[in-house]
Structure formats: C-alpha cells, structure tokens
Amino acid sequence: TRKIIELRHLIDAFFFMKIIQLHDYFKDSTGVVTDSRKLIQDCLFIALRGENFDGNQFAEFAIEKGAKYALVDRPEIARKNERLILVEDTLQSLQELAKYHRKKIKAKIIGLTGSNGKTTTKELINSVLSKKFNTKTTLGNFNNHIGVPLTLLEFDEDTEIGIVEMGANHQKEIDFLCQLAQPELGLITNFGQAHLQGFGGIEGVITGKSEI
C-alpha cells in the first residue's frame, strides 16, 4: 500500500511539474488561441479536437504564422518542431492550465449561471463594478468547458474582479466549472425550461444550477 501511495505522489508531482512548465510557456506567450484562423503573434496555440475537426492538423501552420508555441496531443505531430509541445490531452491541459493560473492571480471571481439572462446580467454587473475596479468578463457567451478556461486565462495580475459566465446542459457541469474558476461569489439569474432533457426535468435544472 505504501508503494502505491508513493507512486501516486510521484505521478501527482510529475503532472504538477508539467502544469508549471506549461504555465511558463503561457506566460512567455501573448495569450492562448484555439482557432488557427484567429492567431496572434507569439501566442500559445492549443490544438483542440472535436467531432469533425482535429486542431493538431493546424499546429505546424500556427507556428509558421506566428504562434510561439503549439500544444498538441499527437506524438507524430510533436516530432516535427521543437516548439510543438506534446501533452496527453490538449483539452485537459487547457483546463488544468486555467485552474493553475486561477490560483496564481489575486482577482475576486464572481460566478454567474442561470437558465437565461446570464450574458445581459454579466454586462450589467461589469458596467457597475468597472467604474471602481479593474474588471474582466467572459467574452460573448464563452461559458462552457472550453470557454471558461479561456476566460480565466485572460485574467492577469492587474485584474481585480473577474465575472465568469457558466453555462450547463447537464448536472455536475457547473460543479466542474467552479472547480476551475473558484468563485468567491455565485449568482443564479433564474431557473427555467432550458435543457430539460439533459437535466432530466426542472428539478434537475435547479440541482444543476445550484452547484454554483
């Protein structure tokens, strides 16, 4: 049992070291980009995968067009350039990077969810708080398992208050997003009929949104 525990600690330490190293790459870049059509000079391109696309295919292109580093999860791609950084899973790495970055910044986070009205409420809160504080908010409706990490990575040491919109269509999703954002204050706009199938009914909606 002791050997198993020691092995687990070694694995955790190795993973933590990789996240620290990845955060160094992030700090050495001009920001994170996941769309090769929207590259900015010296950015960190993260090659995400989807049902109908594989960002790994655009990693070399991203480097050629000005990305400083590109995060990939296909070994055969990573071998082609020393600035192509291999990880086990690019989405998980994005999320863990955001979680680590959140711990490094001093901003107070407001988490905002609800069946509807989130974006409008977010903008209203920001319009008030920005008069006194340095605030940053979710861009548009980037409020899911990809959008929330990208939002957190936009916050820097000068950010005093961050307003993070969180969307969900099934239970445990808000809980996961809160693990990333670690909000000091949670707000729920309302409980409605949206995503009833995913939540299993209105009671599921209430339970899911209340995870904040």
Model-assigned labels for residue ranges:
Residues Q92-I212:
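Phosphate-binding loop of NTP-binding sites
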Residues R2-E96, Y100:
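N-terminal leader/targeting and accessory segments in enzymes
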